A protein has these predicted regions:
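Catalytic cores and adjacent binding grooves of peptidoglycan-active enzymes
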Residues: 2, 43-48, 131-181
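N-terminal secretory signal peptides and thylakoid transit peptides that target proteins
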Residues: 3-27
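C-terminal segment of N-terminal export signals and the immediately downstream linker at the start
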Residues: 30-58
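Solvent-exposed loop/turn segments at secondary-structure junctions
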Residues: 52, 64, 117-121, 151-153, ...
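Active-site acidic/histidine clusters and adjacent loop/turn architecture
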Residues: 63-113
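Acidic helix-start/capping segments at beta-turn-to-alpha-helix junctions
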Residues: 109-123
């Protein structure tokens, strides 16, 4: 009799442990926003440059790694158009933007206002505006200013802050959000 009771106890214990393992696994599954980056799939960005009139659709990550030719196209797209200077943009910025679009539930084109800025351009802008930082992340290829048509700036800001992935600036009077890595 004791043997039968122990077998039932062991069977119930195994079921309980298995159920606990399933529950734990479900609890640590990535959230949809995290899954956007953690799932190996292509990452595509569509952008319009409001100063140059250019548009781009770039698959910068193929599910296994970054695509260098596409990163080069994005670097050119994010160039300092005033000085016609190009700098390598931190791919993490593109990842952030892709993830942000996932959080917002949109793949609408991003309206780029400012990407890379040379130090000279940054200094010129600083002379005209108090809102331009002396050691701006734009000069390092680690920042962008943008908006997305049809998405409230306040929602873009909230989503960017929720990622905790870098700096976030909110400029509703100038109609843009700033993110950096």
């Amino acid at each position: 009799v004791d043997l039968i009771i122990m077998d039932k106890f062991d069977a119930n214990r195994r079921k309980l442990l298995a159920l606990g393992g399933v529950a734990l696994g479900a609890a640590i599954l990535p959230t949809p926003a995290f899954a956007t980056l953690s799932t190996p799939r292509p990452r595509i960005l569509t952008l319009n440059n409001l100063h140059t009139g250019e548009s781009i659709k770039a698959e910068f990550f193929d599910g296994r790694g970054y695509i260098q030719e596409e990163l080069a196209k994005l670097n050119h797209f994010f160039r300092d158009y005033r000085a016609n200077k190009i700098k390598s943009i931190d791919p993490g910025l593109f990842d952030q933007l892709y993830r942000l679009q996932g959080l917002l539930g949109t793949r609408k084109p991003v309206q780029l206002i400012s990407g890379y800025r040379s130090i000279d351009t940054n200094n010129e802008l600083r002379a005209r505006s108090r809102g331009v930082a002396k050691k701006s992340y734009h000069t390092k290829g680690q920042a962008m200013d943008f908006h997305i048509e049809g998405i409230a700036l306040s929602n873009i800001r909230k989503a960017a802050l929720s990622m905790r992935a870098g700096g976030v600036g909110y400029y509703p009077r100038s109609n843009f959000v700033h993110i950096d890595t």
